[in-house]
Amino acid sequence: MPRTTPRTLTCGLLLTAALTSSGIAQTTPSRAVLPTGMGEAIDRDVARLRAATERLKVSDAAVAAGYTPETNCVQHQPHGAMGIHFNNMALRDATLDVETPEVLVYEKRPDGTLHLNGVEFLVPFTAWTKEEAPSIMGQKLKRADALGFWYLHVWNWTVNPSGLFADWNPDVKC
C-alpha cells in the first residue's frame, strides 16, 4: 500500500482544488467549459463570469441576491432548451457588466434541484439609445423585438454543443 506523506497529501489537495475550480471535477458535464477555444479574452471573461456567479449556483442564493424565477423551463425542440430564467429587474438598464448578469439560467435536475447552467445579459430597448447593438464579451447582443430587449446567452457553467453563446442547448431538458 502506498505511503501517504505530507507531500503526497499536499499534491492531492492541490490537484483537487485545481480540478474543482476549473469545473473538471464537477458531476455535470464531464467536458470543461474552459478553455472555450475562442481566444484568451473570451476565456478571461468566462473565468470572471464564473467567479462572479459561483455563489449563485444555489438558487436560494440567487433569490437572496435579488433574482426572481420568471419562467417555466423554456424549450424549443428540436433545438433544445434554455432552462428556467431568474431575472434581476434592478439590473435591467443600459449597463452591461461581465460580473453582474441580468438573468441566471437554471436547469431542473431529475432529483428536483436546480443547476446553474449559464446567464443571459439583457438590455431593454427603452434603455438603449445607440444605433448599434450593445455588446459584451466581444459579442453583439441579439434583438428580441417581440420581447422588447437585446440579449445574449452565455453557457458558463455547462458545455453547450451548439456554442458558448447559442440560445438553445440540446443537452438541456425541461
Ranges and model annotations:
Residues 2, 18, 106-108:
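Residue-level signal for functionally critical sites in structured catalytic/ligand-binding pockets
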Residues 10-20:
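Bacterial N-terminal signal peptides
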Residues 2-10:
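Bacterial N-terminal signal peptides that target proteins for export
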Residues 22-25:
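Sec/Tat signal peptide C-region and signal peptidase I cleavage site
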Residues 27-174:
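Primary mode marks residue(s) on the alpha4-beta5-alpha5 output face of response regulator receiver
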